[in-house]
Amino acid sequence: MLFHGEYTAYIKSGGRVQEAVGKNRRMERSSMKRKFLAMTLALAMGLSLAACGGGTASTPAPAETGEVEATTPAETGSTGDVITVGFAQVGHESDWRTASTKSAQDVFSAENGYDLAFVDCDNDSAAQLEAVRNFIQQGVDYIIIDPIVSTGWDAVLTECEDAGIPVIVIDRTIDDSDKYVSWVGSDFKVEGLACGEWLKAYAADKGITEINALVIEGSVGASATIGRTDGFKEIADREGWTILDSQSGDFTEAGGQEVMESYCQSYAGQFNVVICQNDNEAAGAMTAMDNAGVTYGVGGDVILVSFDANKPYVQMVMDGKINANFECNPMAAPTVAEIIQQLEAGETPEKEIYVSESWFVAEDNVSTITVNGEEQECIYVTQEVLDARPY
């Protein structure tokens, strides 16, 4: 168990760990970059002098850039003390994603001895692969990937491996687990199981004997979508619940509203549970149900459940608009920084590290649930609980 301020990371070992790349190897790459820069400057000066002797030199046109913009890491100093980190982020589709990005920018700051090259891939998997390859060309010391999809990574991870750049995966997972150093994130299936176990206990307490659920899934192919779907479906199948429909809202508010509007038309009066796989989808679903005259939350006709538990949506739990919200902790960056420091010291980090998470509920009738044989607390949201939320 590792402690990172307010956050606890649960560790699970397994798989082949890529060879640790420490300070000496990083300094070798830094030295190579400095030599290359010196050669480039020398050549540029020579060309400049030749141009001055032979007439006027034309101003070169700026190089064309792709659609993906990134902050470029500065050259490391002569001591190689600054650690350059490339971060290929999924995008900016949700409040959770914004919190994840801010965490990385805060942790990998100049004040902390880092130079962060950040790329918002805007949910474009091809752009994400390009971003990682650009990081390799830039010669960063470490690469962080929050993968848009879990497949198609073998070639680019092999390129990272060949370049001697350790890769750390956060949040979502990828299939090529032998080609990255560590993964830091959530157990998405456990989140789905917890949702199902809470709903089972809540329905029993309220005397609800029939569950007819609608699910608004996240992005197709994302490990968060797969895990939450599989976990909830496992409980639904066991309990004999009906899942009327399940469609992707792409983890966005607009997507959640669009899917829920369709549901309100197709299943009017037939559903009593809506499961949204993130907070932004829940916001869209609430708008659609408001427009359709469907009541939800505490005292409503529909039990509304969300995932992520960003602070504004935990507020909605306290207000009774959302019945339960299952946290997905976006603060992976402190744990990633610890992994980097382990690699710098020549140590081998754990392969899988799970961040701690909590389950938030609007009523105090279900205080605990059992998930995979482990009793877990359901936190009744009060103002004190809300004030303590860091994001």
Q: Predicted segments — roles?
A:
Residues M1-T84, A110, T158-I165, E375-C378, ...:
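Short, low-complexity disordered leader/linker segments with a strong preference
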Residues A70, A74, D81-I83, I216-V220, ...:
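Hinge/cleft segment of the Venus flytrap/periplasmic-binding protein
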Residues S78, V85, Q128, V184-I211, ...:
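Hydrophobic alpha-helical segments within soluble ligand-binding/sensing domains
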Residues T84-E111, L116-N134, V140, D146-S150, ...:
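Extracytoplasmic "Venus flytrap"
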Residues W96-A110, Y114, E191-W198, S223-W241, ...:
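Short, solvent-exposed amphipathic alpha-helices that sit
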Residues F118-D120, D175-A201, S246, D319-P330:
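Short beta-strand elements at the ligand-binding edges of bilobed clamshell
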Residues Q137, D141-D162, F232, D245, ...:
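Hydrophobic alpha-helical
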Residues T151-V190, N212, N310-M318:
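Flexible loop/hinge segments that line or gate small-molecule binding clefts
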